């Protein structure tokens, strides 16, 4: 995994196989070796330059030409590489790239500023982070302010792994503070460095008669990387089970994802709704879903 930040460059490189470990057995997540990619060719609208952009998706090797919404039936992976269509204007966003590593590939995740210019009149700048996750994006993107609401987060999953394994490399931007830049708003600073993150949440989900989705948090792994590293191979991170709030190493950001941070999922009516985490489960509870996210920034969307 590589992360890059184009502000001063923050990169995270994921070079896996990404795998889950349980009971002395290691199981690689499908396409988690990152050696196969779908290549998409998207032509942006004439008003913003009619440039053809290349988008990369983790999945069985293929090339797709044309501005069609993408959904991979074979791969469980989604990313921040998406096609957007706002007010009739088509735009492609690219922040995840395949990159050669040894005999195969890794993923390079970047954080940087994207500019959109129209006819030399409008110049919109947005801070974009690179993310690779289990789930899918509901293309085309319609705005930049409701990112989670456009993602189906997580996949059905019923195991209880003890840890997550992957290779990674980090290059931070070197800037002492993050920036806030969401389009037409003025650029501002947020205290503290930007850091790549990894989130793994094991949940027990259910749906009520009105289509609301609720969840208990069964397992938790939250990592924030605050230092530059060369390649770290076979890094092994322990998944914590049950209520972790009494642990000495507990941080508030490891808790329930609520409000603007709530993850979404499709209900039985086909509507993407918030997954409302309402309590802590135990290691004995059934697991129904896993959320797994690798992001180049913990604050690019702030």
What is the predicted function of each stretch?
Residues 1-28:
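Bacterial Sec-dependent N-terminal signal peptides
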Residues 168-189:
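Short amphipathic, basic-aromatic surface patches that mediate peripheral association
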Residues 23-161, 165, 180, 191-302:
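Aromatic (Trp/Tyr/Phe) and Gly/Pro-enriched flexible surface segments
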């Amino acid at each position: 995994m590589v992360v890059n930040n184009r502000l001063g460059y923050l990169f995270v490189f994921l070079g896996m196989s990404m795998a889950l470990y349980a009971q002395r057995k290691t199981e690689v997540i499908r396409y988690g070796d990152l050696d196969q990619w779908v290549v998409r060719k998207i032509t942006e609208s004439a008003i913003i330059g009619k440039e053809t952009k290349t988008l990369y998706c983790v999945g069985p090797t293929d090339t797709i030409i044309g501005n069609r919404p993408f959904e991979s039936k074979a791969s469980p992976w989604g990313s921040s590489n998406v096609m957007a269509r706002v007010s009739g204007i088509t735009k492609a966003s690219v922040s995840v790239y395949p990159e050669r590593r040894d005999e195969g590939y890794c993923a390079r995740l970047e954080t940087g500023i994207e500019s959109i210019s129209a006819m030399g009149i409008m110049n919109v700048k947005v801070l974009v982070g690179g993310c690779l996750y289990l789930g899918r994006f509901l293309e085309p993107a319609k705005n930049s302010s409701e990112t989670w609401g456009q993602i189906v987060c997580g996949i059905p999953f019923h195991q209880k792994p003890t840890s997550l394994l992957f290779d990674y490399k980090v290059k931070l931007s070197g800037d002492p503070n993050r920036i806030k830049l969401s389009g037409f708003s003025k650029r501002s600073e947020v205290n503290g460095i930007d850091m790549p993150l990894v989130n793994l949440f094991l949940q027990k989900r259910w749906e009520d008669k009105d289509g609301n989705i609720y969840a208990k948090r069964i397992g938790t792994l939250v990592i924030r990387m605050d230092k530059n590293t060369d390649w770290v191979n076979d890094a092994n991170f322990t998944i914590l089970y049950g209520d972790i709030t009494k642990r000495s190493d507990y941080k508030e950001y490891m808790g329930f994802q609520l409000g603007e941070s709530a993850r979404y999922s499709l209900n039985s009516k086909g509507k993407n709704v918030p997954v409302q985490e309402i309590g802590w489960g135990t290691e004995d509870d059934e697991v129904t879903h896993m959320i797994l996210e690798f992001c180049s920034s913990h604050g690019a969307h702030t």
